[in-house]
C-alpha cells in the first residue's frame, strides 16, 4: 500500500489473490495482479470468481479461468468493497468519492443509484456495501461522524427510498470497515483502528489503539450488540 513503510521492501510492489484450504490452512493457489495494480477489496461473483477493486487506479477486475479481466471503463475514482447484485449479473460498487453505482458485468456499463428526493442520505465515504435483497448495508468511514447504515432500495435496485442509522457517534464505534451478512444478521468491524494511524501506517501522536470490536445488527429484533 502506498505510504506504508512498516514492512520489508521485499513485500512491496505487488498484489495477489490467494486461495487457502479452509480445513488444513494450506495455500492452494496464488494469482498475481497485473503489473501496477494495487488490490484493495474483494467479493465473489455468482460462480465464485473473485472480483477485486483497485482504490488507487479506480479499476475493477474479475478473475476467470486464471486470467484477470478488467470490467469497468474508467468510471470510478476510488472503488471499495463491492457487492454482487441480486440478479447475479450486476455489481454494486461504492466509490469513496462519487457514491453508489451499478455495473453490468457483461458490458461494463455503469449507472449511478439515485438518492431519495425526500430523505436523502450522504453516499460519499462508503468503505463497503453488503446486499440483502432490496436492502444495502453500508459502512461509512469517510463522513463525520462515521456510521453504519441500512439503505432501502426500490424494486429495480436503482433508487434509494430511505435509510436507517444502525450505529453512529456511539462510544463503541471507532472507524468501521468491513462487514458480512450471515442469515438475518449483519456483522461488522466497529473499530478497525485506521483512525489511529497516520499516512505511513504508524500510530499518530496522542492516539491510542483499542481492542478490536465486532458488532452484530439483527433486523428481527432490531438492534446492535458487541460480540
Question: Where do the model's predicted regions map?
Answer:
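Structural signal for beta-propeller blades
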Residues: 7-8, 17, 58-61, 99-101, ...
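Short loop/turn segments immediately following the C-termini of beta-strands
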Residues: 2-5, 55-57, 95-96, 141-143, ...
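Beta-propeller blade signature
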Residues: 12-23, 150-154, 202-222
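Short, conserved, GDST-rich strand-edge loop motifs in beta-rich repeat architectures
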Residues: 1-13, 81, 191-211
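Asp-box/WD-like beta-propeller blade repeats and closely related beta-sheet repeat scaffolds
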Residues: 9-49, 53
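A short beta-strand motif characteristic of beta-propeller blades
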Residues: 26-32, 67-73, 109-121, 161-169
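Beta-rich, blade/repeat-based domains predominating
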Residues: 1-3, 33-50, 75-98, 118-139, ...
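Short loop/turn segments that connect beta-strands within beta-propeller blades
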Residues: 21-26, 63-67, 104-109, 152-157, ...
Amino acid at each position: 500500500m502506498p505510504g506504508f513503510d512498516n514492512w520489508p521492501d521485499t513485500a512491496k510492489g505487488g498484489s495477489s489473490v490467494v486461495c487457502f484450504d479452509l480445513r488444513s490452512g494450506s495455500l492452494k493457489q496464488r494469482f498475481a495482479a497485473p503489473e501496477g495494480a494495487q488490490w484493495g477489496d474483494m467479493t465473489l461473483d455468482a460462480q465464485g470468481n473473485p472480483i477485486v477493486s483497485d482504490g488507487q487506479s479506480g479499476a475493477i477486475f474479475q478473475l476467470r479461468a486464471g486470467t484477470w479481466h478488467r470490467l469497468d471503463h474508467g468510471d470510478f475514482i476510488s472503488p471499495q468493497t463491492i457487492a454482487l447484485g441480486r440478479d447475479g449479473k450486476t455489481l454494486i460498487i461504492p466509490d469513496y468519492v462519487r457514491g453508489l453505482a451499478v455495473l453490468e458485468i457483461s458490458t461494463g456499463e455503469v449507472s449511478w443509484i439515485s438518492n431519495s428526493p425526500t430523505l436523502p442520505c450522504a453516499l460519499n465515504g462508503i468503505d463497503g456495501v453488503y446486499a440483502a435483497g432490496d436492502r444495502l448495508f453500508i459502512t461509512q468511514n469517510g463522513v463525520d461522524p462515521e456510521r453504519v447504515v441500512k439503505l432501502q432500495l426500490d424494486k429495480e435496485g436503482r433508487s434509494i427510498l430511505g435509510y436507517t442509522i444502525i450505529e453512529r457517534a456511539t462510544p463503541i464505534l471507532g472507524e468501521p470497515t468491513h462487514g458480512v451478512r450471515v442469515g438475518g444478521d449483519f456483522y461488522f468491524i466497529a473499530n478497525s483502528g485506521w483512525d489511529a494511524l497516520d499516512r505511513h501506517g504508524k500510530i499518530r501522536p496522542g492516539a491510542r489503539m483499542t481492542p478490536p470490536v465486532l458488532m452484530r445488527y439483527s433486523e428481527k429484533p432490531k438492534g446492535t450488540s458487541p460480540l
